Amino acid sequence: MVPGLQVLLFLTLHLLQNTESSMVHLNSNGYEGVVIAINPSVPEDERLIPSIKEMVTQASTYLFEASQGRVYFRNISILVPMTWKSKPEYLMPKRESYDKADVIVADPHLQHGDDPYTLQYGQCGDRGQYIHFTPNFLLTDNLRIYGPRGRVFVHEWAHLRWGVFDEYNVDQPFYMSRKNTIEATRCSTRITGTNVVHNCERGNCVTRACRRDSKTRLYEPKCTFIPDKIQTAGASIMFMQNLNSVVEFCTEKNHNAEAPNLQNKMCNRRSTWDVIKTSADFQNAPPMRGTEAPPPPTFSLLKSRRRVVCLVLDKSGSMDKEDRLIRMNQAAELYLTQIVEKESMVGLVTFDSAAHIQNYLIKITSSSDYQKITANLPQQASGGTSICHGLQAGFQAITSSDQSTSGSEIVLLTDGEDNGIRSCFEAVSRSGAIIHTIALGPSAARELETLSDMTGGLRFYANKDLNSLIDAFSRISSTSGSVSQQALQLESKAFDVRAGAWINGTVPLDSTVGNDTFFVITWMVKKPEIILQDPKGKKYTTSDFQDDKLNIRSARLQIPGTAETGTWTYSITGTKSQLITMTVTTRARSPTMEPLLATAHMSQSTAQYPSRMIVYARVSQGFLPVLGANVTALIEAEHGHQVTLELWDNGAGADTVKNDGIYTRYFTDYHGNGRYSLKVRVQAQRNKTRLSLRQKNKSLYIPGYVENGKIVLNPPRPDVQEEAIEATVEDFNRVTSGGSFTVSGAPPDGDHARVFPPSKVTDLEAEFIGDYIHLTWTAPGKVLDNGRAHRYIIRMSQHPLDLQEDFNNATLVNASSLIPKEAGSKETFKFKPETFKIANGIQLYIAIQADNEASLTSEVSNIAQAVKLTSLEDSISALGDDISAISMTIWGLTVIFNSILN
């Protein structure tokens, strides 16, 4: 086999098993390439690295047991920030970085935020983004609250690597079982415990049995399940890994399919082990034989270094078409002047059929350093295209400046085909460099993205959209984890301005940003007139905008100092009809203030039609989600067709969890094969956008244990005050590129309703009101979550398994009067279940499907439960004596408040 092809095949197979950025791979049952990165804001602490090592070593043994001898941790890289002191044992990172780490160690955004969690917003079985541990969690022994740190790591690893979900539910800790008993939301039901309310007022604490809530007929809101310290149940790690007996995941044999938890909702009531054992990891990892325990993991200590970037830009003859050379230079100049961080090392290479080093690495400390590089941007296009020559010159520019290519970044832009690109794949792999690729126009080499994929770089596509090149370059910012260094796009717009007409607009500049603020305009024919006014009324005019020195039709204004907070207004006109663009970039106002951020990506970088693609956008400040924003995705196909999608954070359709700051939507509007680009715009909605001060889906805070007949309570979780659960957010704008993705097998256009059904309803709720059952849910669409479904099919049963396993034979509800609304709307429907004898205590289960005009039917929804209870006294009788007995067992117990953590 050709060596380069062998490398390509290995890397391609490796990429199929990984998320967009993770370097983790499984080799002979051992996980390799795991990266744990420490945030630059974390002060150096000699105890931190030993604690991480101890946690992972402990986790490896526990993981081996939990996976039934299939997997363990073989090697781990710990990446410390550049701000820490150098040590002989610290090695230089290769492609490891904070932004690509599997585990990050960072301070919480708020006080009392030490709960571990995994950022996970994909579908069942999809891998998560990262695990977040705080330094305080790693340095404080909270064994009673979370259990040993190694066990917590395995719980979070199952989220991250295998895409399973929690089996508890802090918002719905109890539910009514089909046996007419109240159960704690858990898996398995073999885990025993006691239900109590613990109240403290003015230093006086009272613990009592839980009372029934007259409205829900479940326990009152403050009721808590206290597990027995000594258990016989072995499952489950996704419920309470802190219990000594728990060493396995719930299986088909002991899975609690009734529990209203995220695992059942997202995975169609499949057990966690069922999801895990069908993962890609387990397809190639049979149980190890002849060993009692795996070898302990090995650790590499790495220290981040100064950023090294080399631009490798195409100046071949085809770059003369459609102003490509000018557009490239506009974007490259903006990148060098506004995006690259100070103290970075930057070089420049241009190539056609040969390559030319224009600048060896220059340390950027002032504007004069930028100008040394921008002065050498290419002015003429000619010759053929040799990408490999360009890359080799880029490597030479780096090594000749006494820097290693390993961990350095190459920004490669080309518009041409190159049949020889595969010849340097092996050299690229050996270099250790990270290659970001920008494909300009539909003829760019098809193998280009392989360079990004095999090196962990970003990939972009730019064509008709005038701002697309600037957007791509603006996205290639620091990966150190120091957000205050990153340049942020506030605006990126193109205007078709008629001669003599005025274009007016506004740019809100919020209080989290304002340093290093630039307003940039580009034009096609003649420089326009512009008037810019800050929130205090100060005006800037055309003469304040500095023209470029390269005749590339751009001008920029840098706001001195820190830009004013508030709404900036602009007006643009000209004597010529032409296309004009406006771009605004800035940086954080202060190193100690987290700026509002937006990031975006697709669920896959490569899709085979008709696979379902999902657009994801995350809006946050630090680790806290921003809710209620107006988030819009612009997707452009290879030949210019554009699709605009409003993204939703409503917990329906493609969205996993409501109000978590992750905005999503299915993308199905394919227009042919090839490359597609993604751009996302985020805007605050006045009086609607807010910052959530609570992190969702975090590790379970264990309230206490029943030990030797006594309830021993842990200190209560420090609560965020009700009035501080959310904070208002001022007006803001963010624009970000989500990179590119490629599609194959898609029709040029057409009716996708004949390919994609309506999306599954995931938020169906049911409630008895009088003799009627009232249903609510979010409407799916004609094509997944787009458009309007044709009709709903509602069925019910007294047994949830009837709906889960044999939906079509369950009792049909007459819903002929129900006309589906537009996707994303709130649906309501009520009906009288006349086919059943309605008696006090009866439980009915309801599920729903939607279909479209092509008779394609959605998956069966989540199963909702409605319980008929006439009065509290009657309901206690109807539910039997078990609950009263369980509730009252507390009165035979002694309650101890454990104020000192072990």
From Swiss-Prot:
PROSITE patterns: VWFA. GO terms for molecular function: intracellularly calcium-gated chloride channel activity; metal ion binding; metallopeptidase activity. SMART domains: VWA (SM00327). Residues 45-199 are annotated as: Metalloprotease domain. The record marks K698, S699 as: Cleavage. Part of a complex composed of complement component C3, CLCA1/CLCA3, A2ML1/OH and ALB/serum albumin. It comes from Mus musculus (Mouse). GO terms for cellular component: plasma membrane. It holds the Pfam family VWA. Plays a role in modulating chloride current across the plasma membrane in a calcium-dependent manner. It is an enzyme of class 3 (hydrolase). GO terms for biological process: chloride transport; proteolysis. CDD domains: vWFA. It comes from the Eukaryota. Zn(2+) binds at H155, H159, D166. This is Calcium-activated chloride channel regulator 3A-1.
